[in-house]
């Protein structure tokens, strides 16, 4: 086998075995290894005793996770957390909830991937016998865990109040989920006022997350269906990771609701992972296929979002790149 074929084989093997790595990260997170190590339980023997396993098996797991720089150290000198493993801890701002939800519900959704791509039925529906949002509605604990998972991955939200002027303005966070975007804006701009809309059964996490702001009457939570109506007279309507879950007709209906409800000089702001039409990044197209597996959603190209806004009666004013393959697209009434 020549060098070219060896490189191709190595690349293929790395891709095919990628799931094994993610499963080991999931196991470490489910067992709480990062928290145990932070507390000083840092050897194979003590970790095994803490989780009810065997030192040799824990050693093999930790050896793999150290090799991929999730943790550092060894059983002789003790394991230690890295910036990556700190994200697995059960603390505010970690990725723990995201890793667990991805490693459970979303892992199951990808299992029937071949059947899903052949039939057009999302993998989640094939795995669970119902669509994603029906499952979340039927299982409140899963709904809560999903919102916490989404909260963990909202790395772009703290950029929004820096890029948009919220001084003395009112905004509507449509489908605001955990309330993390609303919280970021209100903490950054004391004169702003917010309304967060989501399904009635989904407001519990946001209520906890925004408790101090609710007490100060700077924000109100509204339960309802965004495809029926949205709160009126807002200056800014935020659609963060919403239209990726919606088909064309539903997206246009939502944009129409926002256009009808907003103040005269209002803006709609789409915050969405978009795909470059000319050079799609690996992560953006991976997220796109994941959206199909989860809920029959899709990530559009930036040009497709601009076109969608135009057909919804809006003219795009600016497009800003954000972290994690995300773009902010600001539009006014056309």
Curated annotation (Swiss-Prot):
Keyword entries, A-Z: Methyltransferase, S-adenosyl-L-methionine, Transferase
Pfam families in alphabetical order: Dimerisation (PF08100), Methyltransf_2 (PF00891)
EC number: 2.1.1.327
One Gene Ontology term of the molecular function aspect: protein homodimerization activity
Notes on how activity is controlled: In vitro, requires PhzS for activity.
Taxonomic superkingdom: Bacteria
Pathway assigned in UniProt: Secondary metabolite biosynthesis; pyocyanine biosynthesis
Annotated positions binding S-adenosyl-L-methionine: 198, 241
Function summary: Involved in the biosynthesis of pyocyanine, a blue-pigmented phenazine derivative, which plays a role in virulence. Converts phenazine-1-carboxylate (PCA) to 5-methylphenazine-1-carboxylate (5-methyl-PCA).
Subunit structure, interactors included: Homodimer in solution. Probably interacts transiently with PhzS.
Protein name: Phenazine-1-carboxylate N-methyltransferase
């Amino acid at each position: 086998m020549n060098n070219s074929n060896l490189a191709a084989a190595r690349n293929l093997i790395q891709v095919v075995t990628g799931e094994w790595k993610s499963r080991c990260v999931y196991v470490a997170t489910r067992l709480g290894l990062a928290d145990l190590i932070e507390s000083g339980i840092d050897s194979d023997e003590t970790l095994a005793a803490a989780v009810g396993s065997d030192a040799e098996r824990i050693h093999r797991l930790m050896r793999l996770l150290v090799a991929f720089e999730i943790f550092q150290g060894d059983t002789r000198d003790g394991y230690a957390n890295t910036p990556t493993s700190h994200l697995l801890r059960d603390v505010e701002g970690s990725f723990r909830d995201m890793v667990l939800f991805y490693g459970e519900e979303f892992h199951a959704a990808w299992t029937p991937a071949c059947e899903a791509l052949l039939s057009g039925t999302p993998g989640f529906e094939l795995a669970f016998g119902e669509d994603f949002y029906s499952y979340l509605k039927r299982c409140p604990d899963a709904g809560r865990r999903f919102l916490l998972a989404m909260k963990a991955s909202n790395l772009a939200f703290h950029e929004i109040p820096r890029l948009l002027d919220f001084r003395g303005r009112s905004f509507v966070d449509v489908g605001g989920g955990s309330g993390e975007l609303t919280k970021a804006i209100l903490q950054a701009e004391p004169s702003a006022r917010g309304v967060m809309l989501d399904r009635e059964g989904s407001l519990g996490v946001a209520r906890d997350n925004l408790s101090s702001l609710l007490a100060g009457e700077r924000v109100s939570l509204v339960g309802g269906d965004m495809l029926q109506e949205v709160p009126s007279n807002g200056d800014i309507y935020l659609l963060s990771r919403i239209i990726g879950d919606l088909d064309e007709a539903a997206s246009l209906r939502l944009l129409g609701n926002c256009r009808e409800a907003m103040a005269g000089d209002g803006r709609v702001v789409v915050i969405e992972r978009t795909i470059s039409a000319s050079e799609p990044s690996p992560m953006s197209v991976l997220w796109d296929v994941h959206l199909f597996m989860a809920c029959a959603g899709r990530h559009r190209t930036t040009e497709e979002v601009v076109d969608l806004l135009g057909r919804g009666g809006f003219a795009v004013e600016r497009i800003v790149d954000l972290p994690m393959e995300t773009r902010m697209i600001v539009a006014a009434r056309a």
